[in-house]
Amino acid sequence: MRARGLSVAIGLLIATEALAGDPVRGRAIVADRQVGLCLLCHSGPFPEERFQGELAPSLAGAGSRWSQDELRMRLVDPARLNPNTIMPSYYKAEGLERVAPAFRGKTILSAEQIEDVVAYLATLK
């Protein structure tokens, strides 16, 4: 299971090597409650967002705490870093349970969106 997560992360890294993430788009994804859903659990530097999560660590300073590769891994396979996490994998489509038919076989975010979020989180020093 862990090897599978690592291979997904490595595959994503290779697939996105040519993609440069856009931090502006990444911020929009993180703040969008219909796309990233990050603020359901996390808080961060989003003064315009009234309700932010308290379940997970703040995103403020994420770029100081983790490298871009570590941020990517946290999005792609968070259970590899913390087996007890409740954070979903944003780039996993197989081996999931209780997935609505409309979402089966689909990732939450595309490879480009993952890179955008990584680029944004890396700016949070």
What are the residue ranges of the model-derived segments?
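The canonical Cys-X-X-Cys-His
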Residues: 26, 34-45, 71, 117, ...
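Short cysteine/histidine-rich zinc-coordinating motifs and their immediately flanking basic loops
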Residues: 50-56
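N-terminal secretory signal peptides that target proteins for export/translocation
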Residues: 1-2
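Cys/His/Pro-rich metal-binding microdomains
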Residues: 39, 60, 88
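C-terminal capping alpha-helices of c-type cytochrome domains
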Residues: 74, 90-125
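Detector for the c-type heme attachment site
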Residues: 41-48, 64, 76-77, 92, ...
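Electrostatic cytochrome c docking/interface patches
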Residues: 15-33, 46, 57
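Bacterial N-terminal signal peptides
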Residues: 5-17
